[in-house]
Amino acid sequence: MKKILFVEDESALQKTFGDILKQEGYEMLSALDGETGLTMAKTENPDLILLDLVLPKKHGFEVLQALKEDASTKDIPIIVLTNLEGTGDVEKALELGATTYLIKASYTLEEVVAKIKKALPD
C-alpha cells in the first residue's frame, strides 16, 4: 500500500482527503503544520507528499526547499496545494521542485486522484 503524507492545517480538508485516499487504496499520514510535516517526511518515508503552502510553524516553501535539499527526501514526489493562484506561488513551488500543484478553490476529487496516480512511481 502506497503511503501519502498530507501536510495541511485544515482538519476538515484532512478528513476529506483521508476518505478519498482510503477509498483509492492509499494509506494517509497527517501533519497539521510544516515542522511536523518535515519531520514525518524524514521518519515515515512516504511515497508522495501533498503539501499546503500556508502552514503554521514552517511555511510550505520552506518545507519544500528542505525536502528537496535532503538526500533522504529529495526524490519524493510533492503535490503543492494553494489558494493563491496568480500570485507566483505555483511558479515558485515548481521552481523549488514540486511535481505539480492543485488550486484549492477549483480542484475536483477526480483531479486529485488523477494527479496523485500520475505523480506516484509504479
List the model feature ranges, each with a label.
Residues 25-32, 40:
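Short hydrophobic/Thr-rich beta-strand motif most characteristic of the beta2 strand and flanking loop
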Residues 33-36, 59-65:
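Acidic catalytic/metal-coordinating carboxylates
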Residues 14, 56, 86:
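The feature encodes the CheY-like receiver
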Residues 8:
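Conserved acidic carboxylate
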Residues 52, 82:
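Active-site residues of response regulator receiver
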Residues 15-23:
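Charged docking surfaces used in two-component/phosphorelay signaling
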